[in-house]
């Protein structure tokens, strides 16, 4: 179904996603809340003419080098996928990674209902990849930490051996 861009609303986006069995609803502040594999929101910005998909993930000890790597990987999948890192830790010591995907409506007079579903599915697949990469980064960090501890343990054992051999 072709929907004129000027008739597109948050409520209409939620209804379209519901028709395709995507659990969504509108909130009081004109966002569409989506509860699928990942919790996300959809924001229709009529002033700047885009649809924005947003989701947040909490990370701990996620340095700038990891963020740079994640951004590089995700941009290679889709150049419209952005990541925002909140420098200020939450109460639990974690930082927020916000994943953003903007779809430009400026050159469109209509949008198809299936296109909205496809955009949602694309965002979910990008979230899956980003989440997977974050898990990989955490596993690599833990493995490096364990290896470092093992190296230190081996050095300490070697020192003890030398002491006892004297």
Regions found by a protein language model. Name each.
Residues 1-44:
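Charge-rich, low-complexity N-terminal segments
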Residues 23-28, 45-47, 87-96:
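Short, ordered beta-strand-loop transition motifs
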Residues 28-35, 53, 97-101:
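Generic recognition of long tandem-repeat/solenoid scaffolds
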Residues 36-40, 49, 79:
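Short acidic/polar mixed-charge low-complexity motifs
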Residues 42-59:
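A short acidic-to-branched-hydrophobic micro-motif
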Residues 55-104:
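Short, internal acidic amphipathic alpha-helical interface segments
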Residues 90-124, 128, 132-145:
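Well-ordered alpha/beta subsegment
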Residues 136-166:
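Short, highly charged C-terminal tails/helix-capping segments
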């Amino acid at each position: 179904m072709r929907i004129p861009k000027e008739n597109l609303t948050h409520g209409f986006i939620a209804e379209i996603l519901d028709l395709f069995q995507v659990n969504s609803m509108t909130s009081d502040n004109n966002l569409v809340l989506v509860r699928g594999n990942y919790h996300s929101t959809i924001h229709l910005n009529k002033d700047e003419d885009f649809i924005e998909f947003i989701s947040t993930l909490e990370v701990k000890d996620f340095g700038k080098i990891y963020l740079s790597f994640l951004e590089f990987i995700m941009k290679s999948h889709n150049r419209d996928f952005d990541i925002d890192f909140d420098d200020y830790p939450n109460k639990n010591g974690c930082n927020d990674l916000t994943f953003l995907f903007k779809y430009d409506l400026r050159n469109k007079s209509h949008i198809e209902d299936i296109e909205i579903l496809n955009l949602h599915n694309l965002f979910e697949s990008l979230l899956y990849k980003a989440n997977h990469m974050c898990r990989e980064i955490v596993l690599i960090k833990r493995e490096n930490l364990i290896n470092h501890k093992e190296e230190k343990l081996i050095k300490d054992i070697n020192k003890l051996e030398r002491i006892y051999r004297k």
